[in-house]
UniProtKB/Swiss-Prot annotation:
The active site is at residues 131, 213. Catalytic component of the polycomb repressive deubiquitinase (PR-DUB) complex, a complex that specifically mediates deubiquitination of histone H2A monoubiquitinated at 'Lys-119' (H2AK118ub1). Mediates bisymmetric organization of the PR-DUB complex and is involved in association with nucleosomes to mediate deubiquitination. Does not deubiquitinate monoubiquitinated histone H2B. Required to maintain the transcriptionally repressive state of homeotic genes throughout development. The PR-DUB complex has weak or no activity toward 'Lys-48'- and 'Lys-63'-linked polyubiquitin chains. Its EC number is 3.4.19.12. Residues 307-326, 412-471 are annotated as: Disordered. One of its GO terms (molecular function) is chromatin binding. It is found in: Nucleus. It comes from the Eukaryota. This is Ubiquitin carboxyl-terminal hydrolase calypso. Residues 45-276 form the UCH catalytic domain. It comes from Drosophila melanogaster (Fruit fly).
Length: 471
């Protein structure tokens, strides 16, 4: 990925302009194993990808590497089984203070020896928007081939780029049609539209309007290397203790890195691990459990048969021993074997569920990929056109706009009503207060004439009648 004003911008521009295209095309057509496209088209055509483990897993499969998957890491302290490497995504801001601290720290561990650089796969990112593929290849092409089946495309790329400079390796990646097509097949339509509007001069690794960058951490010859395509050299973080795993060294390096980065209150990053396909280990374990289940079940049947023969007095009542492939050569009761068989059945059921869950995850990866890459523009435009043709679009728009107006109108009406009620209440109170002296004068005059104020039943009944009428 290119950061705004990043160091690889000039290189990417040179590639886009097709500089040295003839020599590189002639050199790399063999590496790709296919007829190369014009270099400018390949360099300009790489699209931005989201940081998603499902997307990366499917991308690895499209590269031809089938026995690998990518998982997101949420807890650094949680152990991870047999990782090939880690991919770290962070927001790239060149002038950020924390970024300068990281640069000052990593500059001391640059590996500048050309022979050492040529012995590993380290490629400079000279093609915009290719950082996701660069990060994956930096892990895969530095793994032991005995432990990982790379597939034809990656094997050819690794073979034919051996001994090349980091810049030429970056050009080899950008000029491999299989990699470019697989990469772009997982991009969102927005990424293509953005590329068409702005060109290839600006690069980021997620369609967020900001620059994000991937770097890889991988163990090579007992040393932890950090491979960043925007750096001029690979970085060697050193080895680890004999009693440690390489992931322990990685945790310490990453904890220090995150401590520097989060000092600026910026925690927008994520960490992914490249690991073996979990389904392979589960399938192998299921095979072993089913073999043991068959052995225990067969031994139990023989034991029960021997017990029956012993009780009937026919044949040899000697109990068979459990085969040495499962347990020590000693006699077991039928109850022991039944308990062991029950545990095996439980383990088999658990692992079958785990395998089903992994298969469901792969299915959801494909569903999410279809949703992510599908272009809904035509559907939305056609749908809105049909609504307009039927004359209901304006009504639907009004229905969605009017509620807000109604709410604001009702609020104003409520305020006016409240003010009117308050004014009426105030007027009534004032009127009542004003009539009080007049009522007192009438009562005083009645008392002077010898009449009791209470002897006015007609007026009181009239008031009560009015209340009844109101009811």
């Amino acid at each position: 990925m290119n950061a705004a004003g990043g160091g690889s911008g000039a290189q990417a521009a040179a590639v886009a302009a097709g500089n040295n295209s003839l020599s590189h095309n002639a050199l790399l057509s063999t590496a790709s194993g296919a007829t190369t496209m014009p270099m400018a088209q390949l360099a300009d055509g790489w699209l931005e990808l989201e940081s998603d483990p499902g997307l990366f897993t499917l991308l690895l499969k499209d590269f031809g590497c089938h026995d690998v998957q990518v998982e997101e890491v949420y807890d650094l302290q949680k152990p991870i089984e047999s990782p090939y490497g880690f991919i770290f995504l962070f927001r790239w801001i060149e002038e950020r203070r924390a970024r300068r601290k990281i640069v000052e720290t990593t500059a001391e561990i640059f590996v500048k020896d050309e022979e050492a650089i040529s012995s590993i796969f380290f490629a400079q990112q000279v093609v915009p928007n290719s950082c996701a593929t660069h990060a994956l290849l930096s892990v895969l092409l530095n793994c032991n081939e005995n432990n990982l089946q790379l597939g034809d495309t990656l094997s050819r790329l690794k073979t034919h780029t051996k001994g090349m400079s980091p810049e030429n390796k970056g050009l080899a990646i950008g000029n491999t049609p299989e990699l470019a097509c697989a990469h772009n097949s997982h991009a969102m339509p927005q990424a293509r539209r953005r590329l068409e509007r702005t060109g290839a001069g600006v690069s980021s690794c997620r369609f967020t309007g900001e620059a994000f960058h991937f770097v890889s951490f991988v163990p090579i010859n007992g040393q932890l290397f950090e491979l960043d395509g925007l750096k001029p050299y690979p970085m060697n973080h050193g080895g680890w203790e004999d009693s440690e795993d390489w992931t322990d060294k990685f945790r310490r390096v990453m904890a220090e890195r995150l401590g520097i980065a989060t000092g600026e209150q910026d925690i927008r990053f994520n960490l992914m691990a490249v690991v073996p396909d979990r389904r392979i280990a589960i399938t192998h374990k299921l095979k072993m459990l089913r073999t043991n289940q068959a052995i225990v079940s067969g031994t139990l049947q023989k034991l029960l048969k021997a017990d029956e023969q012993g009780e009937s007095g026919n044949g040899d009542s000697q109990r068979p021993d459990t085969p040495t492939t499962l347990l020590e050569p000693s006699a077991f009761t039928a109850r022991d074997l039944q308990s062991l068989l029950k545990n095996l059945d439980t383990e088999i059921a658990i692992n079958e569920q785990h395998l089903a869950d992994e298969n469901d995850r792969r299915h959801m990866f494909k569903v999410d990929a279809s949703r992510r890459t599908h272009n809904y523009d035509k559907f939305i435009c056609t749908f809105l056109s049909m609504l307009a043709h039927q004359g209901v679009l304006g009504e639907l728009v009004s229905q969605h706009l009017l509620p807000s107006k109604k709410v604001s109108g009702q609020g104003a009406a409520n305020r006016i009503s409240k003010q009117s009620t308050t004014a009426s209440a105030g007027g009534s109170t004032a009127a009542g207060t004003a009539s009080t002296p007049k009522t007192q004068q009438q009562q005083a005059a009645a008392a002077k004439n010898g009449k009791s104020p209470s002897k006015t039943p007609g007026r009181r009944r009239k008031g009560r009648n009015k209340c009844r009428k109101r009811k």
